[in-house]
Swiss-Prot record:
GO terms for biological process: protein folding; protein tetramerization; protein transport. It comes from Pseudomonas syringae pv. syringae (strain B728a). One of the proteins required for the normal export of preproteins out of the cell cytoplasm. It is a molecular chaperone that binds to a subset of precursor proteins, maintaining them in a translocation-competent state. It also specifically binds to its receptor SecA. The lineage of its organism: Bacteria, Pseudomonadati, Pseudomonadota, Gammaproteobacteria, Pseudomonadales. Its main location: cytoplasm. Signal peptide: none annotated. It holds the Pfam family SecB. HAMAP family: SecB. GO terms for molecular function: unfolded protein binding. PANTHER family: PROTEIN-EXPORT PROTEIN SECB, PTHR36918. This is Protein-export protein SecB. NCBIfam families: PRK05751.1-4, secB. Belongs to the SecB family. The gene is secB.
Length: 162
């Protein structure tokens, strides 16, 4: 037994797949309550609509930016109570993956990391707007990625990173 590092093990570790979160940040954030303060005097019977989108782009070398956009519109009856949108972004170091694994990592794994931060930002804005807390349910980004991949295959498209 020796205390010397195994050069083969070090080389394999450097050449193997690597994934590292470099930074998480809010890229854009907005909150609108067009009917306040009148909306606060109404009975609260909300309906929630959630739209989400992801995009990714290669920055330099093996660094990628992934942006998760969540847009939430809450109606109370026929009126819009509030609209909140967040673009939660992250910079990731990703290397040593084949095209399929890279596409899945950028399209599902990274958004899974970003979602709790976006959900917290939305809840915080909603509460600061004097509305009841809004805890969004978890999103299955693997299933959404699989659906998008199937749609692209049927359309003859291939996933790309811009």
């Amino acid at each position: 037994m020796t205390d010397q590092p195994n050069n083969d093990a070090v080389a394999n570790e450097e050449n193997g797949p690597q994934f590292s979160l470099q930074r998480i940040y809010v890229r854009d954030l907005s909150f609108e309550a067009p009917k306040s303060p009148a909306i606060f005097r109404q009975e609260w019977t909300p309906t929630v609509s959630l739209d989400l989108n992801t995009r990714q782009k290669q920055l330099e070398g093996d660094f990628y930016e992934v942006v998760l956009t969540l847009s939430v519109t809450v109606n109370n009856g026929d009126e819009v109570a509030f609209i909140v949108e967040v673009q939660q972004a992250g910079i990731f170091l990703i290397k040593g993956l084949d095209d399929g694994a890279m596409s899945h990592t950028l399209g599902a794994f990274c958004p899974n990391i970003l979602f709790p931060y976006a959900r917290e930002a939305i809840d915080n804005l909603v509460v600061r707007g004097s509305f009841p807390a809004l805890m969004l349910a978890p999103v299955n980004f693997d299933a959404l990625y699989a659906q998008e991949l199937q749609r692209m295959q049927e359309a003859g498209e291939t996933p790309t990173v811009q």
